[in-house]
Structures are given as structure tokens and as C-alpha cells.
Amino acid sequence: MRKKSSFYDNKVVIKPWGYEYTIYRHLNKLSVTFLKINNNHRTSLHCHPKKKTGFIVIDGKAKIQLGLYKENSEYFSSPSKLMIRTGLFHSIKGVSKNGVSALEFETPMDKHDLVRFKDDYGRRKKPYEGKNYSKKIGENFIRFKKPLFGKDQFYKIGKSKVFIEVHKNFKKIINKKNSTIFAILGGKIVDGRGRNIISYGDIIKTGTLKKLSQVFKIKDKLIVLRVLK
């Protein structure tokens, strides 16, 4: 799995609806993919049988279908978040004039853990795109650097501000606005017996972190991706 998926670390994958590329990867545990979906185009209606998936819309507006029925669709404007359980079919459509940009969080990383149920471009039941649909990432593409304690990173993507930070405790995290979105890139929030409450790939807001901080603790260091307007 790692050998096959790591091929995409330095590639842009060309899609009929736009493109995507790996903007960050933590070993084989977590992959963050940048998606650009053009206006009035959508991804296949697909699911991931083995991995947990989360999205943060960082620019534009998306229409996201959950499940097999179109009626189960909602609009998400930037910045907004969504967690998708293992095996749930979903599709994302760009409805803004300039399309939609999103970050996809996959746990664990496996590009080939993909089942396409329906597709506008004839890819139904077909696997993930191979090397014939990829090209080398250009220097103008944003790539997140390795997170280091005391060296926060900042990126402006569309109308969203993206920070990557490393925290030893909750002190600075819980002082953020309640609308702030956090994605966990590394580390864990655990209970008194060391059991995971929140781990890499989870996406939550400040309000949830405030409540969790009253009972649980950060194990070692927590690496977060923070998004706000």
C-alpha cells in the first residue's frame, strides 16, 4: 500500500473535474490531498471501504452528496468541515463560479481504497487514476512543510487562512474563536488510561476542543492544521 500510494507524493493527478495532489503526508497514517473541482463538475459518487475521510472546504462553495440519493445533499461554503465514515458513498460538486478548493484527509493513506458507484465521466467501477493521468508538481503549488514545535506555518488559500502548529497542551488552542476548524495531523488526545479520544485525521472545532480539554489530555504533542477566514 505504501509503495503504490507514495508514487503520488510529488505528482498532480489530472481529473475530468479538475485536479488533486498530496499537499502533506504523515508516514502512511495520514494523507492530506488538495482538491480543485471546477464549476458545475463533480467527483464520482464513491466510497472508501477501509479508510476514514474528512474534508475542509477552504475556498468557494460545494454541494456534497452523502449516500446514494441526491436528496441527501448539502451546501458547504468556505471554511467548513465534514467527516465521512468508512464505506459511506459521497460526491463533491463545485458550485462557485471559480469552482471549489478543499483539503481531503485520509486515514490511513491508500489511494487505491476506492469504489466508484456512479460517475459523469465513464469511470464507474474503475480504479484510481494511474501514472498516465499524472504529472510532476510545479513550484507554484503549495506543499506543507514538516511541522516543528515553535515554528508555526501560515498559508493563504483562497479566502481561508491555514496554520500548521504543534501544541504541548490546550492553552493556546482553546482561546481561538469557536468557529475555528482544527484537523489533527499528528498526536492524540487521550483519557486517563491512554485510550484515544481524538487522533490524526479527525476534524473538530474550538468548542469541542474546549469541552474535551476539561476531561482529557494531549499525549506528547498535538500537530494541528487550523483554518479560519
Regions found by a protein language model. Name each.
Residues 91-96, 175, 184, 212-218:
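Asparagine-centered strand-capping/turn motif at beta-strand->loop junctions
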Residues 36-37, 47-64, 68, 175-191:
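Short, conserved beta-strand element in jelly-roll/cupin
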Residues 41, 50, 88-89, 98, ...:
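A generic "binding-loop/recognition-motif" signal
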Residues 17-18, 38-41, 46-53, 59-62, ...:
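Catalytic cores of nucleotide-enabled group-transfer and carboxylate-activating enzymes in metabolic
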Residues 10-51, 137-179:
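A short glycine-rich, His/Asp/Glu-containing loop-to-beta-strand
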Residues 2, 6-9, 14-15, 95-145, ...:
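Double-stranded beta-helix
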Residues 66-90, 190-213:
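Short acidic-glycine-tyrosine-enriched beta hairpin
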Residues 34, 47, 66-68, 94, ...:
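Residue-level recognition of conserved beta-strand positions in structured domain cores
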